[in-house]
Amino acid sequence: MINAKTKVIGLIGHPVEHSFSPIMHNAAFKDKGLNYVYVAFDVLPENLKYVIDGAKALGIVGFNVTIPHKIEIMKYLDEIDKDAQLIGAVNTIKIEDGKAIGYNTDGIGARMALEEEIGRVKDKNIVIYGAGGAARAVAFELAKDNNIIIANRTVEKAEALAKEIAEKLNKKFGEEVKFSGLDVDLDGVDIIINATPIGMYPNIDVEPIVKAEKLREDMVVMDLIYNPLETVLLKEAKKVNAKTINGLGMLIYQGAVAFKIWTGVEPNIEVMKNAIIDKITK
């Protein structure tokens, strides 16, 4: 029941109408008996500068941040957690005692989702497509104990991110951390991860980022997109019987970590998952 004491948490991005985060978080708040509500705010890039001051004025207690604001939002925050500083992107904000503090739960969320499906991810050869906020978080997390190739349409961005990861994590650039265009050679690659919006609702019938002929049965193909659950990339992967992982797990795990940051309470993962599955299957 929403009343005068209800605490508000928001999602800021553009667009946001495709998001399942409100469904997932509101189900988790209800399950834990917490007087919170989660609302999606469609924020145009030119209005981002007003968000934090506006939120403080209104008493909003936190946010998730999604495309395209994960990097740009950082300049408006009072403090940034060390992991988010390292990654150079923020996806979670807590506002407490007049301070807006930025965190990043994307990287750990992706790892948790991946390891839930295939076990410990260590010493693997991984290609990450994209060089934006989500790609940064996942790449920094997985580069700690795996070999990474950043593949991006704009090769200069891939190179810059690969160099930054190698430098910050003390990895060998050109060996442990590499870069490429989208036509990356997948020989010897164990896992590929799509961290671009290619294939995301409503543009679900686009050309996949990788075609089936470049994929193998012994690969793991993960797409961070969760709407649709089966993207064009995952359809291609199924043609060669590769292991596929959609973006639902990462959405839930990054959300669960954010939930704990805002409330101090561990959410019920199954409640979050079932709320989304109910929505998708209706």
Curated annotation (Swiss-Prot):
InterPro entries cross-referenced by the UniProt entry: Aminoacid_DH-like_N_sf, NAD(P)-bd_dom_sf, SDH_C, Shikimate_DH, Shikimate_DH-bd_N, Shikimate_DH_fam, Shikm_DH/Glu-tRNA_Rdtase
Catalytic EC class: oxidoreductase
EC number: 1.1.1.25
Domain of life: Archaea
Keywords, in A-Z order: Amino-acid biosynthesis, Aromatic amino acid biosynthesis, NADP, Oxidoreductase
Keyword DNA-binding: no
Biological process, per Gene Ontology: amino acid biosynthetic process; aromatic amino acid family biosynthetic process; chorismate biosynthetic process; shikimate metabolic process
Binding, NADP(+): 130-134, 152-157, 196, 200, 224, 247
PANTHER family registered for this protein in UniProt: BIFUNCTIONAL 3-DEHYDROQUINATE DEHYDRATASE_SHIKIMATE DEHYDROGENASE, CHLOROPLASTIC (PTHR21089:SF1), SHIKIMATE DEHYDROGENASE (PTHR21089)
Oligomer status and interactors: Homodimer.
Function field: Involved in the biosynthesis of the chorismate, which leads to the biosynthesis of aromatic amino acids. Catalyzes the reversible NADPH linked reduction of 3-dehydroshikimate (DHSA) to yield shikimate (SA).
Name of protein: Shikimate dehydrogenase (NADP(+))
Originating organism: Methanocaldococcus jannaschii (strain ATCC 43067 / DSM 2661 / JAL-1 / JCM 10045 / NBRC 100440) (Methanococcus jannaschii)
High-level lineage: Archaea, Methanobacteriati, Methanobacteriota, Methanomada group, Methanococci
Gene responsible for this protein: aroE
